[in-house]
From Swiss-Prot:
Domain of life: Eukaryota
Record's protein name: Olfactory receptor OR9H1
Disulphide-bonded residues: 95-177
Species: Homo sapiens
PANTHER family: OLFACTORY RECEPTOR (PTHR48018)
Gene that encodes it: OR9H1
Record's bilayer topology term: Multi-pass membrane protein
Role noted for this protein: Odorant receptor.
Amino acid sequence: MVNFTHVSEFVLLGFQGGPGMQAMLFLIFLILYGIAVVGNLGMIVIIWVDAHLHTPMYAFLQSLSLLDICYSSTIAPRALANSMQEDHTISFGGCAAQFFFLSLFGITEAFLLAAMAYDRFIAICNPLLYSVSMSHQVCVLLISGSYLWGVVNAIAQTTMTFRLPFCGSNEINDFFCDVPPLLSLSCSDTFINQLVLLGLCGSIIVSTFLIVLVSYIYIISTILRIPTMQGCQKAFSTCASHLTGVCLFFGTVFFMYAQPSAIFFMEQSKIVSIFYTMVIPMLNPLIYSLRNKEVKQALRRSMQKLSL
């Protein structure tokens, strides 16, 4: 008979190294998190105060900025604390909560990026129907639906993962509570969990990516048919920033979770984890502001008001 011991806490191993290494990690995490919070908060405020940006496109962007703040805040505070102290433990409940919110915000962002692609598709391919197809009610429905699916996924994943019996080592070879390292600590067969992970999360990621892909195939084909170069550039500039953000998000997710489990627990995987949990939330406000003329104009108007 196997003796299952109840695990009351986990140890987040993170990156191994001496005090110098940990101090450097603290500085890196602090800079990434600080820029992510300030940048995304600034984006939310600019869209909120500038009436010219009160459109569905920027409502989605505002929601994305809020998601990025929440997403990075689920990881960064714990990572900062662990890099400055020897005790890297996290309670069972704390690990479950972190896991839940990571699942919630990650899947919600995938749906939100798909909704943003659909918004650009309607705006460029069917501009005469835009006010009807992307009304305020539709916009609210798409945003709330994204969160709803995120909650459903998070509840399913968290319930199935933390109902597993854990025995032996309680060391998670990462700096946050993620699915693969948690499943490796379970004493029981995790085939059903892996099947649900592949079926639920995999289908969500693939389906949202396909929505984005099909939308941009139509968008690009429509842009290429615009007779004037100026019109073509203007149309492409409205979706170039979103396309960049989509490539960063889905490219990193596919790289992270589509690789064989045998090579998952490598230091490179931890670096990729930092990229999609901290670097992407930091880059998004820069991408959407520096490559968007309307946001830059709104920023100038806000600066002029402050200088008066």
